[in-house]
């Protein structure tokens, strides 16, 4: 199968699987399938590091579906580490962002972490969960910065959407209930993962 056809097929099936998760069905396990599909697509193209990051995300989704928060955090932390490794291996950009832009983005990420530290983490009663969330948040934001440094729109937007989704999860779980939280969490999550996949395809 040609690269373009493979790309169209992988994205199309992902969109269908993700859309099924929002349908009013009795089986709500569709959420574990989209990332497994993307992982298999990357594996079929011998993109092993990308496939590993997506597979760890799939395992995180499985743990989330089973409401196992600590294993969920652990698998997504492994996914972020693998994404960071992936970005270090992908084709580097022809030019880097100017230093003021890089510093501004770092300040934005630091502000997000500071907000989580002051607003979300103190409301977590389990010290193990709080510690895991603190470490995971650092890895997530490091992944976001690594994606940003590639000057690739898909990678940057995908990583930012990943951050948005996880921030909403934290607020919804520990601060206050967010109306339509499932949509608010899963739409940016699915879009973010898809854009990370698409962006990585362009740099392999």
What are these regions (language model features)?
Residues 1-204:
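Polytopic alpha-helical membrane-helix bundles and their juxtamembrane interface segments
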């Amino acid at each position: 199968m040609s690269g373009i056809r493979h790309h169209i097929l992988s994205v199309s099936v992902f969109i269908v699987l993700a859309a099924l998760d929002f349908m009013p069905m009795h089986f709500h396990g569709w959420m574990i399938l989209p990332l497994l599909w993307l992982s298999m697509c990357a594996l079929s193209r011998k993109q092993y590091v990308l496939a590993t990051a997506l597979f760890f995300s799939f395992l995180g989704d499985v743990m989330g579906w089973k409401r196992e928060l600590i294993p969920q955090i652990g698998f997504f932390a492994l996914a972020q580490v693998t994404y960071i490794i992936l970005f270090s291996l992908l084709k580097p950009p022809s030019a880097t962002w100017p230093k003021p832009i890089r510093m501004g983005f770092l300040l934005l990420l630091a502000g997000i972490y500071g907000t989580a530290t002051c607003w979300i983490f103190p409301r977590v009663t389990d010290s193990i969960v709080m510690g895991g969330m603190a470490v995971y948040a650092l890895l997530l934001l490091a992944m976001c910065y690594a994606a940003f440094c590639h000057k690739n729109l898909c990678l940057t937007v995908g990583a930012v959407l990943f951050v948005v989704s996880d921030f909403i999860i934290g607020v919804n779980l520990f601060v206050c209930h967010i109306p339509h939280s499932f949509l608010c969490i899963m739409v940016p999550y699915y879009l973010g993962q898809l854009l990370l996949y698409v962006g990585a395809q362009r740099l392999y």
